[in-house]
Every structure is written in C-alpha cells, then in structure tokens.
C-alpha cells in the first residue's frame, strides 16, 4: 500500500514537472517574441508601449505563484492520497492494511511538517502554509488516534463473531454457565464500544471534511490573490 502511495505521488510530481517545463517553454517564446518586437521597432523607428511585454510579465508572475503553490500542494497530496487508501482499508476492515497505511500516514505527516519549517511563503503569505499544517496535524492525528481505535474495535468485533459462532454451533443444553457468562459479557462490551466507535468515526469524518475544504478554499483564494486573470 505504501508503494502505491509513493507511485501516485511520483506520478503527480512528474505531471507537475511536465507542466512546469511547458510553462518554461512558453516563457522562452514570450521572451523571444518581445525581443523580436524590439528589434523590429528599432529598425523601423516604431515606439512600443510598455504594455507590449504585459503577457510576459503575467506569465512570469503566474509561474512564481504556481511554483510556490505546487510545493505545498505536493505535501498536501501525499497525505491526502495516503489517507484515502487508509479509509478504504478501514472500510474493508483489513487490519493489516490499516496498520501499514497508518504508519505511512504518520511518516508522511512528519515529513511534511519538516518541509514546512524551511518553506519560504510567497510574499510572506502564510495562509496556505497554515492550511497545509492544519491538514498534516489532522492526518497525523488520524494515524495516532483513529487507526488504533479502529483496529481495537475490529479485533473486539472479530472476537465476538468467533464466540457467537461457537455458541451457535452448540446446543443450548450443552453450553456451560461460564461460556454463557463470558459471551454475555462480550455482548455488553461490544454494545458499549460500538457507540464510542461510531462517535469517533463521525467526529473524524466531520473534521476531515472541514480540514480538506479549508485547504481547497485557501488554495483557491491564494491563487486568486496573486494571479492576474485579466
């Protein structure tokens, strides 16, 4: 599972690198265009206004903003994707996969926090940095609190199902008092824990939705604040 997360991250990184190369090529062509315009203007004594290189200025500014944004997006993407794989493991009740992806999520959350320590925000705008930090804090909390809770409940439920199967396979008159008492105790324990489990799941679902939505909105606002769309 961790290998899948790494491959997806590498694919996203490769896509972004390709996009950046395309933008770089466009910048080169815009620079050439501006240079040729100046040569032509000088040759024929044509006055070129300041706005002739406006496209080049906008492209340069856009690239600076997107380059800064991309660094934070890659940090966000890595934990967001790993989190989605973890949630699928939880949904399928795969304890081994839950543990593996939980470990990976904690690792990527810590790595992201370290990257943020040396990250240089664009124009000292900390909005997206803080939104990314909030996401990393949440995913680490998922790894350290949600996953153990899910594993604990899954193991308890598995124990209950095995005990129920054993009891169902026995005739009522062949069940010992100790077996009945132990099974009833297990039933009470499951009934108690299922409520706590559902509360935990619901809380993390709400927090996850709010955290991701906050990152997306902050991301859109960050780009809109600095990219010249006109």
What are the roles of these predicted feature ranges?
Residues 1-2, 112-136, 148-155:
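Short, solvent-exposed, charged loop/turn and helix-capping segments
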Residues 3-102, 156-230:
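C-terminal amphipathic alpha-helix
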Residues 75-82, 108-115, 142:
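Amphipathic, well-ordered alpha-helical segments in soluble domains
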